[in-house]
Amino acid sequence: MAKTFQKEYYPGIGKIKFEGRESKNPLAFRWYDPEQVVSGKKMKDHLRFAIAYWHSFCGDGSDQFGSPTHFYPWDSVADNDEKIKMRLDAAFEFFTKIGTGYYCF
């Protein structure tokens, strides 16, 4: 994975894999096996998951009822170019680890 910074945003978490329904690993797929063939197509072709970049990495979790609920490392960075690079690094690290092939706005 190409990085613009030398930082891992989700340390200690490897690629999320299918481990089956008996798995006790909270960071494993129990039912979704991307390579399993269902009705002639792989599951990953039936279920094309996408992560909403803006909503997942640019917001602060606030809504009309209250204050922000989460804070990211890049929130406190003053330089906008650096902030954008950090946000993109974190997003693509997440996309890679969870194994989604798509992202959207």
What do these predicted regions represent?
Residues 1-105:
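N-terminal pre-domain/capping segments
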